[in-house]
Amino acid sequence: MGKPPGARNPAEAEADGDDAVFLELSRELKEEGTRLFNRRDFEGAAFKYDKAVQLLPAGRRVEAAHLRASIAHCYMRMSPAEFHHAIHECNLALEAVPRYSRALLRRAACFEALGRPDLAWGDIRTVLRWEPGNRAARQISDRVRTALEDKGISVALDVLPEDENEIASAKGEERKKSRNKRFDSVAGGREGENGIALLESASTEKQAGPRQTNGTGNHQDHTEDSESNGLEKLEQSTETGEKDMGKKRGAHAAGKKPRCGESKQQKHSAVNHCQDNIGAKEEVMKDVKLVFGEDIRCAQMPANCSLPQLREIVQNKFPSLKAFLIKYKDKEEDLVTITLSEELSWASNLAVSQVPIRFYVVEVNHVQELGVDGVRRRPSFATLERNRDIMLDNGTIGHDVEHKHYADDWMVQFAQIFKNHVGFSSDAYLDLHDLGLRLHYEAMEDTIQREEAQEIFEVAESKFKEMAALALFNCGNVHMSRARRRPCLAEDPLQEFILEKVNVSYDWACTEYAKAGAMFEEAVKTKSDFFEGLIALGQQKFEQAKLSWYYALACKINMETEVLELFNHAEDNMEKGMDMWERMETLRLKGLSKPSKEKVVLEKMVLEGFVKDISADEAFEQASSIRSHINILWGTILYERSVVEFNLGLPSWEESLTVAMEKFKIGGASQADINVIVKNHCANETTQEGLSFKVEEIVQAWSEMHDAKNWRSGPLYFRLQPVFRRRAPKLHHILEHMHYA
């Protein structure tokens, strides 16, 4: 026995019931948003529309697009700063319904308001292809075309008439509207800026029939369901339940006969404006490549492109450029600067067909680009000064044009009265200045020869050394970060290509590591007790050792001596840095009972406010955090060394692993974390699936140990943050994958 035709799965029926509930809630929110919009509460309306979109059942693409367009309208009404949000909502609406002209028009209006007529023209041209009689699109297209022509960019429309009768009726309707001077209005249409109001007023004129919202016929609901581009037909085909809603709306508007003919005439009322452009072909575009150093970007330019147009295209592709020159390669492979539009046509003729033309962009100063066609000469200072004088030549401020410099009479009188009032002679000012400088230098010489001044000089010297060492330390951290540059690999590259890129990246990283090490060493030389430089130097040697080890395995070369030597240097620097910090911490604890020499000097100079003391608890937490992180980093170095020694067959790997576990314990790692690390050592694996350990488990253990100790002990010492929080470079994982692939 089969299932009856009308029988349905209970789960499906329940799902349909839920969809109906959510759909009803969504439409209620939509109506609330419409009421808020009519009250000019655009922010509240946008919030309601967004909630309505979230409650829409899946598959309601048309309603979702309509709501997204309404949200965009709300953003357009708020302020120009919200235009970017409006563009985003229009993009979402077009993703749901690609042929949605209202979203395209609103996005075009936003682009026009933001000063991007080129982007607005693309949307307007698309709408006019679908609807040649769209009045809003025509009005925006006129403004956008004017803006583009002012920039030297010629544009044309490729619009075809839909029907001769429609064109004739559109002409008659246009003449009628011109004669009667009667236009429908929209909510807030007179307050729009940068073409937004014209867009909305024209958009309402092409709607089918004069609908009323909340009993007022002069305000058009900006979220009405009828669309002139076939959106209503699509909605009727996807929603079977719209018939009931249509009946309700029909009953609400009973007694008013819809004027379908007028709707059709309004839709094509602007066809007569596009007759001059009917049949116009789209301008042929050429593909070009714009090369700016290592950055290559593709673009298109018209076949008969002028140099100002090309400079505009380059400026759009590279917005950060202030002044630049455009060059091309001639037959002798020489780079020739393009200064005229004729030279641009020569460069285009040299290009091979079916191959994009390559233009080389070079950034220069403003003086070098003078003389290039399309570049305006900046006015000189004398010209600006002369223009300022001309602007000031207005009424009481006017003066004889032959006198470049002048002083008003009231200025001279005021200066004389002021001198007499205060008894000050301006003629003696120069002598007073020289006398003051002489006394100042004599006082300084007398001061610096005293014994008290020597203590101040010592404190100043120490502070300047610390500042210089810290600057070198930060510069070294910059080079360490540069060494982590990720190699650019294709999705499915060849083995030879990978090796070439890896070799280049390895050389780059080694160079940056060497620069970073030199900076850290110079920092320690500048300030002998700068322990941060030794810790950073130890980590630099450690990262370089790991990179060399992975590179040796991937490329099958012998670098055993170099790797072990780098590990030795890393351990030595960590030990020196730890000892130096322990001595400094001991001296600090001993000096808690008496003030430091620096503090005594600053108190004598009444400058103690420039030194911020931390409490004993904060100092203890900071010391515990530094000790923990140094020991964990030291243990990591020893652990990685044991991995390398095990793979090389050296018996010392057990000793390195044992010392590493001790460092982890001192650093505050839990016994469970240490057991995970020991278990994942390559010596305990029966089958070596990876280079040294299972990445997932070890990363989880490190994360738990790092978070537990770091954030429990308080904030990390700010100077060592880039050292302790630095992750392994991507190149390490690529080399490991190459070795086992």
Curated annotation (Swiss-Prot):
Compositionally biased spans, kind Basic and acidic residues: 171-184, 219-247
UniProt keyword terms in alphabetical order: Chaperone, Repeat, TPR repeat
SUPFAM superfamilies: CAD & PB1 domains, TPR-like
Source domain of life: Eukaryota
Biased composition (Basic residues): 248-258
Protein's UniProt keywords contain Amino-acid biosynthesis: no
Biased composition (Polar residues): 201-218
UniProt TPR repeat ranges: 26-59, 65-100, 102-134, 496-530, 532-557, 558-591, 628-663
Gene3D superfamilies from the UniProt entry: Phosphatidylinositol 3-kinase Catalytic Subunit, Chain A, domain 1, Tetratricopeptide repeat domain
Pfam families: PB1 (PF00564)
Domain PB1 positions: 285-364
Subunit details: Interacts (via C-terminus) with O1. Interacts (via C-terminus) with OP10 (via N-terminus).
Name the record gives this protein: HSP-interacting protein
